[in-house]
């Protein structure tokens, strides 16, 4: 599995600000979107382009345009919505597929409860976004769902990832690509990433 820890100074700086315990909902939400945008820039660096001719101000001009598979952005509800706008800044014409999966706090197992995928998803590249890759259960369940629907070109974008989640994802889906702003130390006894970001969903939506 291709694993990319994005080490750009802007990514590290913005992620560091997100780790502040008393950060406001507004600021956390803004930074989640901004880091999501920067991760998208990295994740789409290998997209193929083609030369096309358009009408320029002084006659025909050749330009480069992205070719190949169309894109669907797949936020995992609910926290993934906090990264979605940042992703769409770079791929504004992408279709949006939504997957709802929550983690049972006692068993740590993923529980699917909603899905709405775009048509012709088998012809698209999926950018799956979720702030945290902890145990990997929710991400694996989401990718299972996408593959069952025919989508096999999948890239995962997360703000922070635990080594345990990375190992689980690689074992289940070695063909996906992972882009993260940080590979953190690991999980605590409750399955939360350390140092992590706390509950990203609560911080994005202002709930407890």
Swiss-Prot record:
Reported cofactor(s): Mg(2+)
Signal sequence residues: none
Binding site for 5-phospho-alpha-D-ribose 1-diphosphate: 78, 103, 130-138, 199
Enzyme Commission number(s) of this protein: 2.4.2.9
Xref: InterPro entries: PRibTrfase_dom, PRTase-like, Upp_B, UPRTase/APRTase, Ura_phspho_trans
The keyword Calcium is assigned to this record: no
Cross-referenced SUPFAM superfamilies: PRTase-like
Function comment: Catalyzes the conversion of uracil and 5-phospho-alpha-D-ribose 1-diphosphate (PRPP) to UMP and diphosphate.
Name of this chain's protein: Uracil phosphoribosyltransferase
